[in-house]
Amino acid sequence: MISLKGISKTFKTKNGAVQAVDNVNLEIEAGQIFGIIGYSGAGKSTLIRLLNLLEKPTEGSVKIDGKALSSLTPSKLRAARQEIGMIFQHFNLLWSRTVRQNISFPLEVAGVPAAQRKKRVEELIELVGLHGRGDSYPSQLSGGQKQRVGIARALANNPKVLLCDEATSALDPKTTDSILDLLLDINEKLNLTIVLITHEMHVIQKICHQVAVMENGKIVEQGPVIDVFRKPKEQMTKEFVKQLAQTGEEEQSLWHLLDEKSDGTIVSLTFVGNPAEEQLVTELIRRFPIDISILQGNISKLQQGSYGKLYLRLLGATNEIEAALAYIRGKEIDVEVIEHDR
């Protein structure tokens, strides 16, 4: 559905050239939710604007549904853009228009007849969960409701692709989850290809099938979300995964426990796919003459399975502990022995 080949974007400034996007290659399949994550200044926003040629690439080609956008005439590019919806961090609504009028706007621009527009607008109001708010103005809506209007407007012309530029960054956690649930529902109902950029690993974890990690204008790591969680290669990716696996408070709590329980072997177990922590601990107790304490654990649900982290303290003879660790590794569970002489 989406193909980027050797995409680069350089901006000229009074202080010299700035390479915002550097030789990016991506293939995004139809119906996928593809997440691009990175810190501020990584080049994410520039990259997503290159997908519909709001920014023109300095080098490389962008293909959407087989069409090379850079080679299209202005009129054909406008037609191609109608198949690419976009939502933004700060909603970009028309404040003097009602919900219905905001959603109707792209249909008016496209020359859709009034009766057809009215029918489509009502369908979209129901789809995004805004029943009863059609005559409200943006100033009368919550942040989440404003973003729902933005989503409905982006879907007005039945696009094949939806681009999301930090669409949940201005929302509180509960509202963020409701918008992510809506995007997931739309993806499943319409088989819509969604490309989103974010700096929040929670967004990737909750709805994405594939992820690309961006740093200094480059894609430094990419793949199925579950694989990137299982074996993050780059240091920045490891930092993002750690954010989800363990909050700052949880990390402090863990180190406090380690200070209290300084004896024994402390191990971190990473489960990916279908975690079965309780079953594993029961098996270890049954098979090996060692004492086991669970220090901390959590599970995050991914689109292709689950990701879990479990911290154990093992007490017993060295050879028995080594045998237990070998048994765990034999289950294809990642094991890390944690040094805790702090």
From Swiss-Prot:
SMART domains: AAA, NIL
Keyword tags: Amino-acid transport, ATP-binding, Cell membrane, Membrane, Nucleotide-binding, Translocase, Transport
Predominant cellular place of this UniProt entry's protein: membrane
PROSITE patterns the UniProt entry points to: ABC_TRANSPORTER_1 (PS00211), ABC_TRANSPORTER_2 (PS50893), METN (PS51264)
Catalytic activity: L-methionine(out) + ATP + H2O = L-methionine(in) + ADP + phosphate + H(+); D-methionine(out) + ATP + H2O = D-methionine(in) + ADP + phosphate + H(+)
A GO term, aspect molecular function: ATP hydrolysis activity
Positions annotated to bind ATP: 38-45
Pfam families: ABC_tran (PF00005), NIL (PF09383)
Cellular localisation: Cell membrane
Top-rank lineage group of the source organism: Bacteria
InterPro entries, per database record: AAA+_ATPase, ABC_transporter-like_ATP-bd, ABC_transporter-like_CS, ACT-like_dom_sf, MetN_ABC, MetN_ABC_transporter-like, NIL_domain, P-loop_NTPase
Keyword Membrane: yes
Key word Iron present: no
Membrane topology, from the record: Peripheral membrane protein
One annotated Gene Ontology cellular component of this protein: plasma membrane
EC numbers: 7.4.2.11
Disulfide bridges in this chain: none
Gene3D superfamilies listed in its UniProt record: 3.30.70.260, P-loop containing nucleotide triphosphate hydrolases
Domain ABC transporter: 2-241
Oligomer and partners: The complex is composed of two ATP-binding proteins (MetN), two transmembrane proteins (MetI) and a solute-binding protein (MetQ).
Task performed by this protein: Part of the ABC transporter complex MetNIQ involved in methionine import. Responsible for energy coupling to the transport system.
Family: Belongs to the ABC transporter superfamily. Methionine importer (TC 3.A.1.24) family.
Name of protein: Methionine import ATP-binding protein MetN 3
Primary gene name: metN3
